[in-house]
Amino acid sequence: MAGNTIGQLFRVTTFGESHGIALGCIVDGVPPGIPLTEEDLQHDLDRRRPGTSRYTTPRREPDRVKILSGVFEGRTTGTSIGLLIENTDQRSQDYGAIKELYRPGHADFTYDGKYGFRDYRGGGRSSARETAMRVAAGAIAKKYLDMKHGIKVRGYLAQMGDVVCELKDWQQVEQNPFFSPDVDKLDALDELMRALKKEGDSIGAKVAVMAENVPVGLGEPVFDRLDADLAHALMSINAVKGVEIGDGFAVVNQRGSEHRDEIRANGFQSNHAGGILGGISSGQTITANLAMKPTSSITVPGKTITRSGEEVEMITKGRHDPCVGIRAVPIAEAMMAIVLMDHLLRHRAQNADVHVDMPHG
């Protein structure tokens, strides 16, 4: 079956291609009475949209979202919310030369192998352009989580190449085009991007995302553990090749005496688990890291084949991001928010009558 939907009670279904007429999504499960306007969604869309700095793709899309249904007089009605974003800056002629080629590192080869037919313009459905609708839907979830439960979801660029950004100042994240919380690393990031542009190459990145004030109890063991669903959602983002929850792969070098999050009367003494124990939220901050591959859309010549099997050398033309991790921050926030809202609704549906006087954690 087509994998265009995520969530059970809070369900998001997206549609559209990179160079199609428009992108859209249907959001089901939003409780009624939530104040919601297009401007509520536009803030995060503006953070994600292309053409906003010299470090991202020059494709200039306004990404103005339209609410088609599910909202009346500024409040959600409880019915399906339809969202639409028109594509306005397609340059499909940039892709005519690759109609018969498989771009190395892209989904061209696998989409052809699966469907026997593909939209080669900008990658079609496989393009990260689709994530605009995830961000729009995620903005709804972020508003609900914050307004009703005080849950805040936010992320930042943790690393680009060898440049590591420390979490020094959250306010800085929105003040620079890199989403970096470390103002001391901005010059190094700028130098790296300039070098990549000169070389016609790209670089990978690590994006961090977290949720604060998440209550104890979210997650449905055993197959719908909260960390499993978060990993699924975050891995579904284009270019993500790895997801860590908490300390992630660093646990390989840790001892049990170090990794266990000891609990005292004043709460947990550490958070190596990333806010999730046994697949259920512990009440601590949920933390995750995403490893993002360097984009294969570069001007460095590469070897590939045509649909008929002929070996050729190609250079990718078009407008692309030298580091996809920069614009991935609002996408990661959206996917985490979508999962958390879905699990909040699922927890309420099954456990509404459960009241436990938990000690402070």
Swiss-Prot record:
Principal EC category: lyase
Name of the protein described by the UniProt record: Chorismate synthase
InterPro entries: Chorismate_synth (IPR000453), Chorismate_synth_AroC_sf (IPR035904), Chorismate_synthase_CS (IPR020541)
Pathway(s) the chain acts in: Metabolic intermediate biosynthesis; chorismate biosynthesis; chorismate from D-erythrose 4-phosphate and phosphoenolpyruvate: step 7/7
Domain of life according to the entry: Bacteria
Quaternary data: Homotetramer.
Keyword Amino-acid biosynthesis in record: yes
Native source species: Erwinia tasmaniensis (strain DSM 17950 / CFBP 7177 / CIP 109463 / NCPPB 4357 / Et1/99)
GO terms, molecular function: chorismate synthase activity; FMN binding
Keyword Amino-acid biosynthesis: yes
HAMAP family: Chorismate_synth
